[in-house]
Amino acid sequence: MLDATTFDELRIGLATADDIRRWSYGEVKKPETINYRTLKPEKDGLFGEQIFGPSRDWECSCGKYKRVRFKGIVCERCGVEVTKSSVRRERMGHIELAAPVTHIWYFKGVPSRLGYLLDMAPKDLEKVIYFAAYMVIDVDEEGRHADMPGLENELRLESKTLSDQRDARVAERLQRLETDLAALEEEGAKADQKRRVKDTAEKEMGQLRKSFDEDIARLERVWESFRTLKVGDLKPEDADFNELLDRFGLYFEAFMGAEAIKRRLQAFDLNQEAELLREQIATGKGQKKIRAIKRLRVVSSFLATGNSPAAMVLDVVPVIPPELRPMVQLDGGRFATSDLNDLYRRVINRNNRLRRLLDLGAPEIIVNNEKRMLQEAVDALFDNGRRGRPVTGTGNRALKSLSDMLKGKQGRFRQNLLGKRVDYSGRSVIIVGPQLKLHQCGLPKQMALELFKPFVIKRLIDLSHAQNIKAAKRMVERSRPQVWDVLEEIIRERPVLLNRAPTLHRLGIQAFEPQLVEGKAIQLHPLVCAAFNADFDGDQMAVHLPLSVEAQAEARILMLASNNILKPSDGRPVTLPSQDMIIGLHHLTTVREGAEGEGRAFASVSEAIMAKDQGSLHLNATIKIRLDNYVPSDAADTGTEPVTAVVETTLGRALFNEALPVDYPYVEAVADKGQISAIVNALAERYPKVEVAAALDRIKDAGFYWGTRSGVTVSLSDILTPPNKPQIVAGYEKKAAKINSEFEKGLTTDLERRQELVKIWTEATNEVAEAMSANFPADNTINRMVTSGARGNWLQVRNIAGMRGLVNNPKGEIIPRPIISSYREGLSVAEYFIATHGARKGLADTALRTADSGYLTRRLVDVSQDVIIREDDCGTTKGLDLPIATVDAEGVLTRDPNVENSVFARTLAADAVGTDGTVVAKAGEDVGDVLIDKLVAAGVVDIKVRSVLTCESAVGVCAACYGRSLATGKLVDIGEAVGIIAAQSIGEPGTQLTMRTFHTGGSASADDITQGLPRVQELFEARTPKGASPIAEAAGRIVIEETDKSRKVILTPDNGDEPHVYPVLKRSTLLVEDRQQVELGQQLIVGTVDPKEVLRVKGVREVQKHLVGGVQGVYRSQGVPIHDKHIEVIVRQMLRKVTVVDHGDTDLLPGELVDRSRYNEINRGALQEGKKTASARQEVMGITKASLATESWLSAASFQETTRVLTQAAMEGKSDPLIGLKENVIIGKLIPAGTGLSRYRNVSVEATEEAKAERYPNRIFADDSAFSENDLSFVDFDSFSSDDYTPGTYN
């Protein structure tokens, strides 16, 4: 088999008949599969052992040769080669077709490649291929030209003869009529009798004339048709054509079916056609030019690859190996088989029948019908259902063809190549493990034993607990006590990976050191739950084992939970204490007025603890304590030395501060969610990861400990309804009644009434909510939960204890009658009914949103998967100017609110100069929190920073333009797959975005504004929004023209160009006034603008701003922080292609989409050779289109439209350079990112002397007990084999 590591490119091409015969090990001649009595494969059948190899290892079919010693012998009795049965997975066969057939992908795909090549409409092609019309293949021009006069004379003569004959026959009939009439006259017949005879005669003469005229006309038609006959003409099978064939069959050839296409293709001159097309493109206009460009693309791809176009017509069909289309016996003796076998059988049956008919010399019409059926059978095999009704099996189910095997989520690409199942893995339910350290997880003993089984077996043999593998296996299965000891020893320091599906971002897989636990559930550290989005209501997680030493090192260094404290999307900590921990710390750090022991002073924390244990001091009483390592809370940096001081605080706060690092400033505040979040933020910024993890564990332990002791419970008596609620509601009921009566009198419209009522009841709800929260005492548990941020919010409490308020109906409008009851009081039936509407819609919405968001993530990953950090610095001087400060009302500079997610963690592109002209920061410096504060203090308003949008790396991006990795807080490493991180960061919060299209004011009068997830999709797909606003094409003056039906905005440019007219709907809101001066690109009406227009009018930078700003707007509105750089990575991919407008003297085709880097490279080459360069226009592509336009055909095929991508790639003979990640996953190579980059793969390590000394300690002076059987910790077991080692001796 192919070894994935030995090749650098993968090419796909068109297989010729010779290629297929070369792959094949024999021809499949019979449609039989296996003999149902002997269950042996039939000879020459679809499973034949002679062709595909033996079905049992080292055993021929008849049983003459058995055993491996006959390897390679071909049995002379049955003709089967003695070899391994696995060859049945790789050996192919073939079917020799009795008539050629076209490949359906090239004929029926959109656009039809065959149609483009032969310049025929697909409808006409279909007529020829399926035997409804003849196609002229060849015309003997010279012969026809030479014989034309003679033939014409002959024809004229014949036509003259015919007309003479006609006249003679008519005259003869007339003569007879006269004779008849004379005879009747003599007999004295009546007038009507005469008339009858006359009519009959006239009718006969008419028929005579008609039949002769038809013959003459046919001659004319045939002659005309022969005179204008050219290659490629279609002729229906009728009398005219038969006549043409009889008379002039020597001068031309016409065929039906794939035979016709094949002959045309064989005679096709690609070079000449390419010349013609280039000429057409140069001179043509409009549709003609577009079609010529498309055709040239097909023609030039055949020229470039050297493929023969005739390979699109098949003479041989390959048969895939039988193990890939298996046939298995079910329990009842029936057989289950792959659909492919049925499809192959139809092909073989029809092929054999056609052969027999040809041998018998059957009439043409029968043979053609059989040929058509063969064509249809091969079509169904390749792509069932592409043309006509699909072939169905039992139960009217369409059979799965070869194309269906590749397509879609269940196809080969996505199911087996990108999503393999892996060994050394297990899954189980998770439970919380509060006793664990941040880098640990609890692994059930049984599960660990199963996972580490091979390692345990090896160690048991090494320690001579067992003599051989079988014995060791038996020991493991019987769980002997020694096994557990060995397992403990092995598991030490070996990380395992835990994963929770759905893995929405890279923190969904993290490494932990396993601790063996009893029971069957995996124990998870509470702080990593947020990253996994896990809870303990029955979630399951999977465990995977990194096997190789490199994998273990990577898991430990890169994936250990304690090294993944920051979120890659915004650089903020993800391991924030939550719920119980917060309530515990809140309980610990509150101050209680007048509590036991207030005002006392203590010499140390220990003394205060003793007082508390004696019961003379309350945890929350204000006291004075002498603290040894005190850093004042206003200390700016970590540099401040700790001092000894007497501090006024509470015992609880002193205990809380003991959980923080020694030199951390003393926290003198209530530890609610915000405070803890700020502390963890500061820890992550200032301390090394080891210390942060330790501090987090201490905070967690303190939180759980005091959370338990706080005794926080919820009972019905804690839910306090405000006593004045009835009075508040009654007051507003009066107001509402007044408005209703005004409406009944006809003073207001229904709309006004609704709006007023909504306003009134919103006020009422707010007033009840305020009364309710004022009514809660400070020590009420619900109040403590909400104010500390542990769980819930005031809205939920209002629903339970205040009033439910207004709700929406399914249309999204607000029902003007509120729900006055709270859940504590209970809802009436009517109230309950209207409340269910909104709630149910919410659930349905969430389900849809999850699917939508998942699909968005998939597209984002696909478009950005090959964006990898490839170099340190691309050397560009370009960058983006971004604001870092805003001027507030008093004229003071403050930090811009969006600084965190725009300039933070980037690299300066130019020196930042303060107001006094001094350089505050040099170009190339990293912009962190400290530097931002320094810049703002120096009066800098905006700075120029590097960005991936302006990066000039040819492949991937450079580290300097990307800036700091948000997950580590350091400059990004080379090999970091920033594209995938960007896709995950944008996709992961996708489920939190709303799905709604907001109706402004509850009525559909104004244009709906798309927001939430649909808006993000619209931006990333670069779609033209519904009701897009026009933008000013030039700077100029506006005139607004209104008629009673329509409204126009007319823009007169300042530079004297033609005025631009924009028709505008009457109901849309204008953003410009009459006679106003506008800038280039200014928006004219309220609504969203089309990114393609922005690009055309204002250029690349503006469209980048528009896309990044638009996506950020949606996420900010939902309070989801994402750094701009992630969105920029995606936008960079959307803008990387240009469309060639004029190809100059280069090899580019006009209208071709090329990568900007490749386009620049080609132009540079042309300049150096002094040729005319190409010109192009920038494109903005949606992410789906951009993914399909990738250089890698493997990646594109595994994304969407598999058959179309493969058809195109095979025709162009595309080579996949295997640069991206997906392609390498598919073929099973290490991905070229992270440690898979060649610069990391080829590193050689030199051990230092200290390391050697540590690894191989000098044992000469050790006491002899060091050589006892069990302590072999200094033996390097990885490189040790048990053959040259006997326990008890060490050589």
UniProtKB/Swiss-Prot annotation:
It is an enzyme of class 2 (transferase). GO terms for biological process: DNA-templated transcription. Its cofactor is Mg(2+); Zn(2+). One of its GO terms (cellular component) is DNA-directed RNA polymerase complex. The keyword Zinc applies. InterPro entries: DNA-dir_RpoC_beta_prime, DNA-dir_RpoC_beta_prime_bact, RNA_pol_asu, RNA_pol_N, RNA_pol_Rpb1_1, RNA_pol_Rpb1_3, RNA_pol_Rpb1_3_sf, RNA_pol_Rpb1_4. It catalyses: RNA(n) + a ribonucleoside 5'-triphosphate = RNA(n+1) + diphosphate. CDD domains: RNAP_beta'_C (cd02655), RNAP_beta'_N (cd01609). Keywords: DNA-directed RNA polymerase, Magnesium, Metal-binding, Nucleotidyltransferase, Transcription, Transferase, Zinc. The keyword Glycoprotein does not apply. SUPFAM superfamilies: beta and beta-prime subunits of DNA dependent RNA-polymerase. Zn(2+) 1 binds at C60, C62, C75, C78. Mg(2+) binds at D535, D537, D539. Zn(2+) 2 binds at C874, C951, C958, C961. Its EC number is 2.7.7.6. One of its GO terms (molecular function) is DNA-directed RNA polymerase activity. The RNAP catalytic core consists of 2 alpha, 1 beta, 1 beta' and 1 omega subunit. When a sigma factor is associated with the core the holoenzyme is formed, which can initiate transcription. Belongs to the RNA polymerase beta' chain family. DNA-dependent RNA polymerase catalyzes the transcription of DNA into RNA using the four ribonucleoside triphosphates as substrates. HAMAP family: RNApol_bact_RpoC (MF_01322). This is DNA-directed RNA polymerase subunit beta'. The lineage of its organism: Bacteria, Bacillati, Actinomycetota, Actinomycetes, Micrococcales.
